Amino acid sequence: MLHLKVQFLDDSQKIFVVDQKSSGKALFNLSCSHLNLAEKEYFGLEFCSHSGNNVWLELLKPITKQVKNPKEIVFKFMVKFFPVDPGHLREELTRYLFTLQIKKDLALGRLPCSDNCTALMVSHILQSELGDFHEETDRKHLAQTRYLPNQDCLEGKIMHFHQKHIGRSPAESDILLLDIARKLDMYGIRPHPASDGEGMQIHLAVAHMGVLVLRGNTKINTFNWAKIRKLSFKRKHFLIKLHANILVLCKDTLEFTMASRDACKAFWKTCVEYHAFFRLSEEPKSKPKTLLCSKGSSFRYSGRTQRQLLEYGRKGRLKSLPFERKHYPSQYHERQCRSSPDLLSDVSKQVEDLRLAYGGGYYQNVNGVHASEPVLESRRRNSALEVTFATELEHSKPEADPTLLHQSQSSSSFPFIYMDPVFNTEPNPNPDPRDIFSERSSLSSFQTSCKFSGNHMSIYSGLTSKVRPAKQLTYTDVPYIPCTGQQVGIMPPQVFFYVDKPPQVPRWSPIRAEERTSPHSYVEPTAMKPAERSPRNIRMKSFQQDLQVLQEAIARTSGRSNINVGLEEEDPNLEDAFVCNIQEQTPKRSQSQSDMKTIRFPFGSEFRPLGPCPALSHKADLFTDMFAEQELPAVLMDQSTAERYVASESSDSESEILKPDYYALYGKEIRSPMARIRLSSGSLQLDEEDEDAYFNTPTAEDRTSLKPCNYFLA
């Protein structure tokens, strides 16, 4: 038995026991099973051969024939095939492993790019590993961990970008990181030193589109698969034969010299595998052995091609299995996962007051244990909402125009979706006065999205959907208009209600409809039928008296001796004066602040509640039925309808780098160079020559025509 050590991308190691005669596929399958990896064809096992070259473990060849001392070799689990667009990766685990590979390439200097681009990528890695920005923690972590060769001079930029990623989950950070990396010139490039026919030092590399020729980090030539007729090697010379109609004035065979025969053969095998994975529709078949002994190589690619992977994933056969990310527990637990909501921050104390006043709902955590106060004791420093609130408060000076508030968006995104409550807007012909004083229902919890997997799940993912049906607690900023026979021409002071349903107002009135609509009819309030002396009617009468005193005071200040609220037409100047008077009494403050006690309630794009709280929404149609027989002031009619609080997912940094067409994984159409790559059904053909091995790609006449297909995810 062989005890073989495999090192994974998170630097963890595991020893697998295989049979003495096992092939490389046995060890590779054990490694993928250890990770619960479904899209395994993108990866491979690399090791250092006896000649000092890094080579890939062949899956069809016995391990003992590839490695002299297997027990002393450490096999490295790495990304082997880099797709043109990481949006082709269906599984979150696959994207996470690609992110770890990008992280290693950054540390080794394999991905040269600008300082801003490098700092932005590292900031996404920090967001995935540490959570939201915290200056002290970030500074300490960057001092202990090396992400870049020149990290010291970029720490300021890294922390600046990390501060803009508040609220993003690790999965979202992985997608953004891969979207940046795929646009770099050296993405997925593994250069192999060589020299051309004139003795100039160059590097050869293979990618999804073909064979590349580089000088330093600059591509000086690209030979697409469609141009190549044959790839072969002879001793340490690597040969590229082109189609005759491609370069008429140049030689159809290009020769490059590599360091050794082993290095040349290893690069040739990599080219064979890349061509099969990206160009063939299915795995190439094995050739029957000939009677005569051949000295040529019989190497072929083993595994599913990219086309098969995409078709297999499109049919939904790939199973998403849970996995554990690499985090830094001491820092992560100390900060209580700052991506989770902070229910006790200064901004959200009003929501907590509502919960205490209107009964504790009943929630269920991830372990199935019910709790009435979920995560109410998690005080932290610099929570996600606090940082966002401070940023928005700074941007809101001077005061923002209330008419433009609905166009603003928060720079942070929270993983919550507040659904619209379902209201019954039908008028109730027989309102029951007891409903006004009925028992209030408990607050309904809401469905959260679990962005963190494994044991690093954030605190907020313990809240689940509501356990029992309950009525939504609705915030209604409705002016309390007395139910009298007179029309109110002046905007009364707004009285806010927190009730389980819209406030029900008795509909009795002795005035006939034609009398109310007549402009010359007037009925004294004393002529109305007296109501029952209930506490509610007493309060209504008191409010009417206070309102009349206030109206008379305003009339005296405006130069009018009498106010007829029922007969004469509404004076818009007087109404404006009244509204301005009330607004002047309100302290000046920014409209972006999330204060539920202001005269005009902030819109949903600025107020983002962070915990189990009632769905706060404007419902102009809720009280149109209650006051259907009265003319509401015009200022009420501009109230917006029910709003949906949906966390945005936007990035404010390096917008020229991030493009929206990447998210093919979530249903958006992808426009990428892959659409221009023509898939070929050609197979490999190996000729038998002494010390010579190569493969032929079919010519333009022999190439099997394949119907153009779009293998991008819908």
UniProtKB/Swiss-Prot annotation:
InterPro entries tied to this protein: Band_41_domain, FA, FARP1/FARP2/FRMD7_FERM_C, FERM/acyl-CoA-bd_prot_sf, FERM_2, FERM_central, FERM_CS, FERM_domain
GO biological process, one term: positive regulation of small GTPase mediated signal transduction
Major site of localization recorded for this protein: other
Keyword terms: Cell projection, Coiled coil, Disease variant, Neurogenesis
Coiled coil: 537-558
CDD domains: FERM_B-lobe (cd14473), FERM_C_FARP1-like (cd13193), FERM_F1_FRMD7 (cd17188)
Location in or out of the cell: Cell projection, Neuron projection; Cell projection, Growth cone
Gene source species: Homo sapiens (Human)
Listed SUPFAM superfamilies: PH domain-like, Second domain of FERM, Ubiquitin-like
Protein's job: Plays a role in neurite development, may be through the activation of the GTPase RAC1. Plays a role in the control of eye movement and gaze stability.
Tissue: Expressed in liver, kidney, pancreas and at low levels in brain and heart. Expressed in embryonic brain and developing neural retina.
Presence of the UniProt keyword Phosphoprotein in the record: no
GO annotations of cellular component type: cytoskeleton; cytosol; extracellular space; growth cone; neuron projection; neuronal cell body; nucleoplasm; plasma membrane
Record PROSITE patterns: FERM_1 (PS00660), FERM_3 (PS50057)
Disease connection: Nystagmus 1, congenital, X-linked: A form of nystagmus, a condition defined as conjugated, spontaneous and involuntary ocular oscillations that appear at birth or during the first three months of life. Other associated features may include mildly decreased visual acuity, strabismus, astigmatism, and occasionally head nodding.
Protein name stated in the entry: FERM domain-containing protein 7
Protein's UniProt keywords contain Lyase: no
All copies of domain FERM, residue ranges: 2-282
